[in-house]
Amino acid sequence: MSFRFNKGAFEDNSFNEQIREALTSALNSKTQSSSQTAPANTTNSAATDEVKQETRGPKRLDILKSGISVSKVNFPSTPQLEILDLDVSAQSRSLLKGICKVSCKNAMLEINTEIEANLLLLYTNDGPSFTTPRLISNDSFTVPITMTFNQIELEAITNIFVKNNSVGISFNDVNLDFDFDCSIKLLQSSIEKRLKGSMETVFKEVLPSVIFSMSQRWFTHGESTCNSASDDKSAGRQVENHSHTPRTILEDCDLEDLSPANMLRLSTLVSSRQSLSLNPTAMNTLSTIPGCLERQNLHRFNSRIPALSNFYPDFYEVESPHLKAFGRSVSTNVISSGKLEHHNALPQRVLDERSYDLKTIASVQSRIFERSSGDGTAIRRRKIKMGKKSKSKKAQSQDIENSSPTVVMPSSPSLEPSAVSTPEALHSPQPTTAVQSPELLAENSESVSIPALILPTQADHYTLPVKTSAPKLNLLEEAHYLNRKREFQKLRTSLYSPIRSNRFNLNKEMERPILEHKGLNFVGLTHGLNWGSEDLPPPYRG
């Protein structure tokens, strides 16, 4: 079953005017209610206003400077209504329930209003006077705005309730599409997003109230409606006035059942919000707000930082008198000279009296390392063994004798140099025989004593001198030393010369100097060869 609307009613401008007035009153219903309650609020006391402001949530700023007015409404095509279901038997005769499908196309709507562009003015008007600054120029700046909705297409499934003199409607499934245009292009995208998000409230509250108010004009006429409307307004005003009258939540007898500690904390919080003071309500705590540090408790925080100076606060003699009056101690970093020392340092008095403890120092250092690293790495300490007895000189000499090999020095025959009478004899060669006669050997054997064979156990022990490690030379000193060694190496000595065995014990040819045939320049060449490879150059030497 379906119905058709009368086309003459939509062709006439009266229907559009009725829709325009109904939409204007519905959109301005909230602003009118707030303006009516404003004079009632001024009569209340200041205490009740503060309690209400504290109990309410955060207040939203209203940027509307004036009311919302619907300037144009146009329905070029007749809306269509299709009844999907109708229930009459189960209900009384005065109630009609049905499910309908409503469709509307090519509708147009234009809305005008004014907004406040100076948001700082809104914040200062709503905020308390003792927290708002005094601005030199804080005037109002009103901007008019016009919003136009074109090509509105609506398809919805609705539940309709008809009872005596009114029609109630609720929207279930809604498909809405429109073209939006705003006079301020900068705000068009943001307003369009907000409108699409607020369409749910439009179809739940605005349109049902508009249809309900228009249905009362369709079904009934006369003074009864005016009287009922006036009665409703008077009843509404009485309810509003009653809602703003102060009410007693707790009586004096009820205060005895409350905890005194809780009441003290509540009163402290209320006073802190009014005076912006941060007096702590708990004892032995750094701050009442977790994660925040108050200025008055900064000395407690500094005293709990792991440092050697915090373990010996009594050894600092200087304290400021103005802090002593409040029962506080000055920071441990301040000394008598007025300069700042390191945070991790012992006082001089502790070092003089030797009143420190190694375990305490180790624990402090480990805590500092754990706080600084934060990655859970193990602490690596340097271990020093104290009280270990050193070996005596006799024990060292015995160890050297046991480790060094034994050497037997054979007795060399005494060689007497032949006397040279004249210089001619020195330069004139004398013939000698390679093989001597047996008689000469016999004579020489009597004069020369052959040493007896000595076993290792019977031989006298000769200890070799301990070789000391030569000092480390740098590149320039090593090159100079090798050049000097080469000059001594060129000497032709005898095979059995003791000079070669003792002073020049060379088994292989010396290495060539490092700096030979290399074009390198060093700063040390002009400074007497006094710095090595591990030291800094002379300009940077400390």
Swiss-Prot record:
One Gene Ontology term of the molecular function aspect: lipid binding
Keyword Cytoplasm listed: no
Subcellular location: Mitochondrion outer membrane
One annotated GO biological process: mitochondrial genome maintenance
Biased composition (Basic and acidic residues): 49-58
Domain of life: Eukaryota
Matches recorded under InterPro entries: Mdm34, SMP_LBD
Membrane topology value: Multi-pass membrane protein
UniProt keyword list: Lipid transport, Lipid-binding, Membrane, Mitochondrion, Mitochondrion outer membrane, Transmembrane, Transmembrane beta strand, Transport
This protein's record includes keyword Transport: yes
Main location: mitochondrion
Stretches for region Disordered: 27-58, 372-435
SMP-LTD domain sequence ranges: 1-216
Low complexity bias: start-end ranges: 31-48, 403-414
GO cellular component terms, A-Z: ERMES complex
Basic residues composition bias: residue spans: 379-394
Quaternary assembly: Component of the ER-mitochondria encounter structure (ERMES) or MDM complex, composed of MMM1, MDM10, MDM12 and MDM34.
Family, similarity comment: Belongs to the MDM34 family.
Domain remark text: Lacks alpha-helical transmembrane segments, suggesting that it resides in the membrane via beta-sheet conformations similar to those predicted for other outer membrane proteins and porin. The SMP-LTD domain is a barrel-like domain that can bind various types of glycerophospholipids in its interior and mediate their transfer between two adjacent bilayers.
General function of this protein: Component of the ERMES/MDM complex, which serves as a molecular tether to connect the endoplasmic reticulum (ER) and mitochondria. Components of this complex are involved in the control of mitochondrial shape and protein biogenesis, and function in nonvesicular lipid trafficking between the ER and mitochondria. MDM34 is required for the interaction of the ER-resident membrane protein MMM1 and the outer mitochondrial membrane-resident beta-barrel protein MDM10.
Designated name of the protein: Mitochondrial distribution and morphology protein 34
Organism: Lachancea thermotolerans (strain ATCC 56472 / CBS 6340 / NRRL Y-8284)
